[in-house]
Amino acid sequence: MGQKWITLENILVEKLILWGIGLGRDTTGKKVLISWGAIPESVVDIRVLKNRSNRIEGQILRVVKRSPLEARLSEHFQVYGGCRWLPIPHEKQLEMKEQQIREVFIHNPEMVAGATWHPIVASPEVYGYRNKLEFSWWKYISAREGVDDKYRFGFHESGQFDRIVNCTYCVLGDDAVNDIFRAFDAFARENRLPTYDVKTNVGFWRHLVIRRSKKTGETMVIVSVNTLYLGESQREEFKKFLRSFISWIKTITSAYLLHNTGKADIVQGNFEHIAGTPVITEKLFDLEFEISPKSFFQTNTLGAEELYRVTGEMIRTKNPVVFDLYAGTGTIGMVLASRAKEVYSVEIVPEASEDNIRNLAKNNIKNVTVINAPVEKLLEEWKKEGKTPDVIVIDPPRAGMHPDAPGILRDFNPREIIYVSCNPATLARDIPLIAPNGEYRVTDITPVDMFPHTHHIEAVVRMERV
């Protein structure tokens, strides 16, 4: 006998909090947290997933009353997992994101007392801003739902790892990206090779990744397939066929075949360069960056320029020595190099450090030193050596700083600390750890909207020595 779900009816969504979760209340005033697709001022019925002492967690069963904020989208605009806020007007998105950054400090108001809250910086592009998009092929067969769809190509359905929604146009990619997507859709349908089934590990088509430079227009495609489905001679024939097809799409300047034979639904495997140049070039300001299939690069080029502009403007020390921590491929360090005496870029991922070194040489930057090491361990070594920075810039992953890092960082006694955050929750956790006894004070906070139509929000925080 199936599980009998508890439901709650007529829950008003008051607002969206971190991670795009809807906040409402039941008839007793108890908090109700609603995942996936909640829109402020709508009224919904929910299925209760967890009933805790201080909150109820659930998902939407049905919308009883649409939000007055909700835009009526044309069929050209489809809502996928990567753009759940698309029905919400962009001005309202900015307002909600700015409020979320303020609210993460609600339990530590003394940390931001006297700080200047700057208006949120909007992305220069609201649509078509992504320089990288990943599409998936899938088949979805369900006897329970009466579905026998052996070909789907698009994005994962919101909250569903095993379902793909057929895509006709992605508003986060530009027209060239969408043209390439539609061409590959037709190509895959016509050649009749089956889509990959993750449950049986059988099938051929898996993913299509499109990387397109906003500044140069150079475009890379990565075609991810299960090459074990074909025999060796068939694989070679397919590669010839694929090269011929790609040659007709003039916007493609680089192409790779990804031999993806693992069971996990991720873009991994052996990359084989099959056409065009091995890399594409993107620009940030007047700097050039080579992007390979595995390279990390901010997915909103123009938004990244805004983020780094804000970061640079936060630094008030003239000609500083800068520690660039969690440097990734070194974009922040390279942008800051022209106004710094010396930059030390620290990153744990070897491939990212290699990209950094290559791009430094490409741009003839001489005052940046790249160190491939864990941040907390290297800081300990530098402390023993007596190395002293004027400014420390921190750009950690979503998990935030390593627990040992804030205390060590404080021991260097820099004039300024700039924290570039992609996760408001860990930002609010780490800032008090850096200055538990008031050694530093927060002077400036600027939210930056790098990802319109999503719940993601960046923020740059400046701290100065007291």
Residues of each region from the PLM?
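Extended interfacial segments that mediate partner engagement and assembly in macromolecular machines
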Residues: 61-72, 79-194, 215
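Rossmann-like S-adenosyl-L-methionine
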Residues: 2-9, 15-18, 229-466
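Internal alpha/beta scaffold segment
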Residues: 162-206, 227-257
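Short, conserved phosphate/pyrophosphate- and ester-handling motifs at nucleotide-, phospho-/glycolipid
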Residues: 41, 173, 300
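Short, acidic/hydrophobic/Gly-rich beta-strand patch recurrent on exposed beta strands
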Residues: 22-27, 154-157, 222-224
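Terminal RNA-binding accessory module
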Residues: 1-78, 377
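Short, aliphatic-rich beta-strand segments
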Residues: 210, 217-226, 288-292
